[in-house]
Every structure is written in structure tokens, then in C-alpha cells.
Amino acid sequence: LFRSDVEKITSLPIVGDVPFSENKSSEGAIVVHENQNDLMAETFRNVRTNVLYMMKSNEKVILVTSTTTGEGKTFIASNLAVSLALLGKKIVIVGLDIRKPGLNKAFQLSRKEQGISQFLANPEHTDLMSLVQVSNINPNLSILPGGPIPPNPTELVARESLPQAIDILKKHFDYIILDTAPIGMVTDTQLISRVANASIYVCRADYTHKADYTLINELGEQKKLPNLCTIINGLDMKKKKYGYYYGYGKYGKYYGYGKKYGYGYGYGAENVNKK
């Protein structure tokens, strides 16, 4: 039943059903850890397997987006990155939602003032790899935060310095995860998609509108996002009869893009309908 409603309104592959996370520990949005075999770890193993199956052996770049804020794209991107690192692969997650960076909070970063926006603005005089931080979660996982919020984010990601940055990262990492802006709110992500090999569209149960699948389907049909798939986030596994209450979620306030920003499911979201 978890997939049935979604399968009726999109033909895109569903690469995962992610349960609701109530984890509010000091480690925040990270729920995947080494030597762990709980439901969440197994869920992200399945997501990892499905996404890698979609990609060719020489493809490295995975883009993660959503329609609006609060659907859990940073949560999904971060835990997928951890799961990939547990394979022994060298992983970097890049904060390309540079209007509202979320990786600082998700990974408890100490150097919050540095990031990719500095390289995009001035690639000739910026050492990109000096902006990359090794995570304290797994030595195989590194983070390239968004950096200072620029006045012109759309123009910045449209520059040739973005593919330059990705080319540099490809020399150092096996996979690159791009945590991008919500595609239903700004055009940044469509511009970023030119450097991606696969795209994950995060939808949240009891929150994502059924009408949003019109946008998702159009993006897939018109190939505006490469190799597009979707993830259903925030399923309440305790409820015996869980329906996707699409059309009842409320996120109008989030369009201000300056309001409270949910970087992971259950973190920072307000007034979400519960059935």
C-alpha cells in the first residue's frame, strides 16, 4: 500500500520508501551508522542499491531535489552519502542549495563560513579542495558546504565554474552527491542538472501535494532532470492503514524561502497535518 497511490500518478521508478524518523539526537539528521542493521539502515541500503543500478560504471554524480522545503531532501542526500561511504567508496556531498544551506546543521560542521559558492564566484583564485571537510561520521565521507550565501545564486550555478568544480571532485571521489534547491521554487536545480548523471526527487508522505506530480512527470518526460527517480519519505510504519494523504499537506508558508527550513524529515517542519 505504501507505493500504490504514487504508482498510480507517476511512472517514474520509486527507489525507496523511507520511514518517519524521530531521531533527535545530537547527531541530528544522520540516521545511518556503521555496523547498524535497523530498519533505517536497511532502507538506505536499498536506496543505494537501486540508485547505483540506474547508473553506468563511469557515472558519479547524483542530484537530490524536491518540490519545496521540508520534504527531506537534505536528510535523504546526507544518509545516502553515509550509506555509500560504508561501501568503502570515497564520497563527497556538495551543498548546492546555496540560498539556504542545510549541510552545516546536518553534519554539525565547524567551518560553516567556507564552501562551494566561493569557488563558483572566483575559481581562478580559490582552491576548491581546501573547502572540503572530512566528516566526523566516516573517513570516506567528505562535505563541501554551500558557503557564504551569494546575492546571485542562479547566475552563479549557471557559470562554467560549476562543471569545473565537478571535474575537480571527480578526480578525488568515487561518487558526488548534490544537495540542490527545491526545484518547484527556483530554477537553480535545472541549471545544476547539466552536471548530474542521476536525479532523486524526494516526496514526503502527508505533505507533498498530488498536483506536484504533474511537475515531477513533466521533468521526467522532458528529460530536464537526468535519469529521474523518486523517493517517498516520512512513512509512518506504525499505522496499520496508512494512506498517502496527498492534497492535504500544507506548505504555502515555505514559498517565502526565508521561513523555517526543514532540512530533514521531522526537523524544522511546522504545522504538518497528521492523520
Where are each of the predicted segments found?
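Short boundary/hinge segments that flank catalytic cores
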Residues: 2-90, 96-102, 106-116, 122-125, ...
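Residue-level preference for the first positions of well-ordered beta-strands
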Residues: 61-63, 90-92, 141-143, 175-177
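Conserved G/P- and acidic residue-centered "switch" motifs that form tight phosphate/ATP-binding loops
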Residues: 74, 95, 179, 197
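Short, conserved active-site loop motifs that form the nucleotide-linked donor/cofactor pocket
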Residues: 140-141, 228
